[in-house]
A protein has these predicted regions:
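Phosphate-group recognition and catalysis centered on beta-loop-alpha active-site segments
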Residues: 1-214
Length: 214
């Protein structure tokens, strides 16, 4: 059975991405979510996509150089709140699937914190474009559902090669790969991002999709 996740909690166009309000709505509809993780200067793991606040809050400051308090002091001016991962875990009530994508490089300290935060979760995966993140967390705890994320320009041969790595349990790739039959040789779960219309959802109903707009 295909697995459907909502991209950054964007179940509706009116929602703000990676917010507790958006996540809660997805959970009421019985959908899991995909979200992005960064670490702040004071080592708080937050749900936020970009490396800086420039796009969202018109402030050209990097997440890694700001504390959690400083980030939300800026976000508040835009009527926004950037949540911590632990807040997301709490509202998921251990019933809804969480795909946690590590956007930035996570230190050993950050990864250990992540492992501790997720140790009671039943339904989740940890993914990243940065293979070092996945290798390093595998060293710390092997029995985790870990995955690599690939861009739309990644050669299929490279994807197939990476799929054979022992620490790669799932693969996440751009939706242009949905029609690529060569990937059928991979005997691991594959997720495709980001489906933004119901036509794709219907056409590929047998695939694991990360989508927006119910």
């Amino acid at each position: 059975m295909a697995h459907l996740l909502i991209h950054r909690g964007l179940a509706k166009k009116s929602f703000k991405e990676n917010t507790l309000q958006a996540f809660k709505y997805c959970f009421t509809k019985k959908y899991g979510i995909e979200t992005d993780l960064h670490c702040t200067k004071d080592n708080i793991i937050i749900c936020f996509h970009d490396f800086s606040l420039k796009k969202k809050f018109k402030t050209n400051k990097l997440i890694k150089n700001l504390t959690f308090y400083e980030i939300n002091k800026i976000a508040k001016k835009f009527d926004h709140y950037v949540p911590q991962l632990k807040e997301l875990i709490k509202i998921s009530k251990n019933k809804n699937y969480l795909m946690l994508e590590l956007k930035s490089f996570f230190s050993k300290k950050n990864l250990t914190q992540l492992i501790n935060l997720t140790k009671k979760l039943k339904f989740f995966s940890i993914t990243s474009f940065n293979e070092k993140n996945i290798k390093n967390i595998y060293i710390l705890k092997k029995k985790l559902n870990l995955g690599l994320v690939f861009t739309s320009t990644t050669p299929i041969e490279r994807i197939i090669k990476k799929s054979r790595l022992k620490y790669v349990k799932i693969l996440v790739m751009e939706k242009r790969f949905l029609s690529k039959k060569k990937l059928d040789t991979i005997n691991k779960p594959i997720y495709y991002y980001t489906a933004r219309n119901k036509k794709i959802k219907r056409k590929y109903s047998d695939k694991n999709l990360i989508f927006e707009n119910l």
